[in-house]
Amino acid sequence: MAKKVQAYVKLQVAAGMANPSPPVGPALGQQGVNIMEFCKAFNAKTDSIEKGLPIPVVITVYADRSFTFITKTPPAAVLLKKAAGIKSGSGKPNKDKVGKISRAQLQEIAQTKAADMTGADIEAMTRSIEGTARSMGLVVED
């Protein structure tokens, strides 16, 4: 018989940098999970990813205090900022443009996000990423 699920915990943790301090410690401590076991497993799984990149993770906690977790791809906004070489998006995206990004870079980001996005095809995903870029104050160049 399958294990009984006690809770789902959603967090964003820096790749390769999970430690028992907030937000990881309190979120998992409330569920009675072995925090260090999660930190070691997460850091081992994300060691191939650029260190410090925020990685969304969904942790399934079972009634016997065991857990499994699924890592997702970094948020589109983080990938866009990295590709454009900017620190943050624009406070007024329609007036103040903070950088430029090419359509090829958008397609590359869409390919990266393809595993997590539910878009019908790569073109639809690219358009979705393009909308995120525009809302951040980035100019999309052909």
From Swiss-Prot:
GO cellular component: cytosolic large ribosomal subunit
The keyword Ribosomal protein is assigned to this record: yes
Alphabetical keyword list: Methylation, Ribonucleoprotein, Ribosomal protein, RNA-binding, rRNA-binding
SMART domains: RL11
Listed PROSITE patterns: RIBOSOMAL_L11
The keyword rRNA-binding is annotated on this UniProt entry: yes
Biological process terms in GO annotation: translation
GO MF annotation list: large ribosomal subunit rRNA binding; structural constituent of ribosome
Superkingdom assignment: Bacteria
InterPro entries, alphabetized: Ribosomal_uL11, Ribosomal_uL11_bac-typ, Ribosomal_uL11_C, Ribosomal_uL11_C_sf, Ribosomal_uL11_CS, Ribosomal_uL11_N, Ribosomal_uL11_N_sf
Post-translational modification: One or more lysine residues are methylated.
Family of the protein in this entry: Belongs to the universal ribosomal protein uL11 family.
Protein role: Forms part of the ribosomal stalk which helps the ribosome interact with GTP-bound translation factors.
Subunit description: Part of the ribosomal stalk of the 50S ribosomal subunit. Interacts with L10 and the large rRNA to form the base of the stalk. L10 forms an elongated spine to which L12 dimers bind in a sequential fashion forming a multimeric L10(L12)X complex.
This protein's name: Large ribosomal subunit protein uL11
Source lineage: Bacteria, Pseudomonadati, Pseudomonadota, Gammaproteobacteria, Enterobacterales
